[in-house]
C-alpha cells in the first residue's frame, strides 16, 4: 500500500477531527472515522489490486519483453496506463503524476467526492456546509497531513542513506531502518498512531 494502514487510520481521525464542528456535526465521531478509514483503505487496496493484475499480465509477456528488449518498468507502466484508462481508475500514486505527495491530487479529490457522498447518506452525521465546501475542507486537511507525511518519509530515507555503510535501497535492512526513522520523523511532527 502507498500509505501504511496505521497512517490511514491516523489520517482518518485527523480529517474527522478537523472538519467536526465546522463542516459536519456528529454525535458518533468514532463511526465517522470508521467510514473515512474504510473508504481510504478500500481506495488504496484498489490500487494494489491493479498493480497485482499488471504483474500477472507481465508474467504472460515475459518472453515478448525479452525478445523485444523492453524493460520491466516500461512494460509495467504501459500496461498500468492501459488498465487505468480501461477501468477508469484514478491513479493513486502522486509521484507518477508529478505531485509531491504519495497520493495524487486527483486521487485526493476523488476520495473527497466519495467521502461527501457517503457522509450525505450516513445517519451518524449532518453536513453543516454546502457539499462542495465540506469536500474542499476534506481536501485541505488531507493535503496538509500528507505533506507532513511526505516530509517525514523524505527525512527518514535521507537518514538511512546517510548511514556510513552502503545500504542498497529496497533491501530488507533499508526497509527496516526506513520504517524506524519514519516513525521517529512522524513523532517530530506530532503524528502518533496510538492516539
State each model region's role.
Residues 152-195:
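Alpha-helical oligomerization segments
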Residues 2-100, 110, 118-144, 155-161:
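Charged, amphipathic alpha-helical regulatory modules used
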